[in-house]
């Protein structure tokens, strides 16, 4: 099994430099407006343009609309899209067809039985990301340093 480190919440050139120096494989850009690490599509474009190998750029989205996906694709080139919402397996397959970009699906884990959800996404995503399931604030899905 391969473990890849993704540092998410990149908002600046300094963040990118630090992620590379620390050996991250992926860097994540949060496009969810409710997040304190949110960046807009214009900022994503500038940061993704300077993201260099071996780093892979990841656009983190929460339940994206088709319109938003189209705007994302027109404004930036990202290596991966991470789906961090309540996207069904069917919706994930639609997103794969619309974007033709490799997908990462985040699965919230609170208890062992939550891991069973992984099977639903087999074959429709390139990676599964296990994250803590956060109860107290449904709008901030993960990435808060909470272990499970």
Regions found by a protein language model. Give the residues of each.
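Conserved N-terminal beta1-alpha1 strand-loop-helix module at the mouth
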Residues: 1-148
């Amino acid at each position: 099994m391969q473990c890849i480190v993704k540092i998410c919440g990149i908002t600046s050139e300094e963040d990118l430099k630090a992620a590379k120096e620390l050996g991250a494989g992926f860097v994540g850009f949060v496009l969810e407006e409710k997040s304190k690490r949110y960046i807009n599509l214009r900022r994503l474009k500038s940061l993704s343009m300077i993201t260099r190998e071996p780093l892979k750029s990841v656009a983190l989205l929460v339940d994206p609309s088709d319109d938003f996906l189209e705007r994302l694709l027109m404004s930036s080139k990202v290596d991966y899209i991470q789906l961090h919402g309540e996207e069904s397996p069917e919706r994930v397959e639609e997103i794969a067809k619309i974007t033709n970009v490799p997908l990462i699906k985040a699965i919230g884990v609170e208890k062992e039985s939550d891991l069973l959800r992984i099977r639903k996404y087999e074959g429709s995503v390139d990676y599964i990301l296990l994250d803590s399931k956060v109860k107290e604030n449904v709008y901030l899905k993960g990435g808060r340093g909470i272990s499970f």
